[in-house]
């Protein structure tokens, strides 16, 4: 068999990619929640480009259009940020049902599959890899143990919020939002501050 290799990979700063300085194992990226097909797609673009200028394509399409004559001699740049962007495209193109299973298995099946399913519409446009999911959604599964802001002086405020929410009969996002906006106006609190406090008390984070 005849073997061919591309030039040495470089970092975005044009320095040589090194296993002593950079994560070069596929297992590292898989552990971050990068899909194998996204990683393969990105690596295919190292030293080669699609004849139609496409960045996203399947392995089957790659096999069909690849020509060894198109390999470039210039040392390609391996950019983890670009890889994450590409993986994000794969996430957004994936059916919610399949993404639910991916997240469920990535989290070692420790969290409710049904609840994961309900949170996907909230984060699908925001995450770029599966490891991004839990930092955004952990508060759905367990009460925060730490809070980034001290809210102990706002107990009366949250009592008023609680009382207002108890009045809501039709528990829908737009109705809840309208009730909270009206309460903020009644209490003469800016929406930005009002909802920041709400975010912190629910998620523990700013």
For each feature predicted by the language model, list its residue ranges.
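Alpha-helical recognition segments enriched in aromatics with Gly/Pro capping
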Residues: 1-91, 195-202
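Short amphipathic alpha-helical interaction patches enriched in hydrophobic/aromatic residues
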Residues: 47, 87-90, 107, 165, ...
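Small-residue-rich helix-loop
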Residues: 96-190
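Conserved glycine-rich FAD pyrophosphate-binding loop
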Residues: 181-206
